[in-house]
């Protein structure tokens, strides 16, 4: 009889924990849907000790996502690492952790996770792209170039890979190559303001300030409310010793930042 009573009490405890977990998890999902990520992360952390073996993995993954969305990148890496201990080699998680490592400037760790993905999927363009970006930020431009070129071979329309290669050329001071490639990309996407800013920056570095201003003009026409474009424009006017226009651009940038909370 005593054993039966113990079993019944244990069963009630288990059912109670399961109900508590399910209640908390539903609340987490609601908070994520409402984009209340900071609160969601707190509730996921409360739910985690109550999660059974099967539920622990999805709880950790969602916790990591919520942490990323609140800028708690180190904690997100820890959560992804714990999830990967449950499912080693999970491609999606390796990719997310690689992205987090990239944000933390832990480039070798990002490359390591990308290599883990490519051991399973050699032509995974997303992993190749993150790896190439990590190499570029490390200053290993030849390896970065190889990665970007391979992505472009796999996905000829991949703009991020093309822009990565433009940046490699710029870092290596291969300005003519950088200008030629960004020119082709602009022909393909003439309504993308970021592309004109990229070309403007190359021209600025070459000392071609008037040309850089023209490209800055194009970017502002396409996105007139972006304060960063006016900040860059102020720098160009300063290079041309036009302090009046530079100050006007800085004031415009400040006003837009206040208006849109950039």
Positions of predicted regions on the chain:
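Helix-start (N-cap) detector for alpha-helical repeat units in TPR-like alpha-solenoids
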Residues: 21-22, 54-58, 91-92, 125-126, ...
């Amino acid at each position: 009889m005593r054993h039966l009573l113990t079993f019944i009490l244990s069963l009630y405890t288990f059912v109670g924990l399961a109900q508590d977990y399910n209640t908390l998890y539903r609340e987490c999902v609601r908070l994520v849907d409402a984009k209340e990520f900071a609160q969601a992360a707190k509730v996921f952390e409360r739910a985690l000790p109550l999660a059974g073996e099967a539920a622990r993995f999805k709880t950790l993954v969602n916790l990591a996502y919520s942490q990323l969305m609140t800028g708690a990148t180190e904690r997100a890496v820890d959560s992804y690492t714990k999830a990967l201990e449950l499912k080693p080699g999970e491609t999606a998680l390796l990719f997310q952790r690689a992205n987090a490592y990239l944000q933390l400037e832990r480039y070798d760790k990002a490359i390591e996770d990308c290599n883990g993905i490519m051991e399973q999927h050699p032509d995974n363009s997303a992993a190749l792209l993150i790896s190439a970006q990590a190499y570029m930020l490390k200053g290993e431009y030849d390896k970065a170039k190889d990665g970007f070129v391979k992505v472009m071979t796999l996905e000829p329309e991949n703009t991020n890979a093309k822009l990565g290669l433009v940046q490699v050329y710029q870092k290596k001071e291969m300005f003519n190559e950088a200008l030629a490639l960004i020119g082709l990309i602009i022909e393909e996407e003439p309504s993308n303001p970021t592309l004109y800013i990229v070309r403007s920056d190359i021209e600025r570095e070459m000392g071609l300030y008037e040309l850089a201003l023209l490209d800055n003009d194009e970017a502002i026409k396409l996105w007139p409310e972006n304060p960063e474009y006016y900040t860059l424009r102020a720098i160009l006017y300063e290079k041309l010793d036009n302090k009046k226009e530079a100050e006007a651009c800085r004031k415009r940038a400040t006003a837009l930042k206040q208006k849109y909370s950039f």
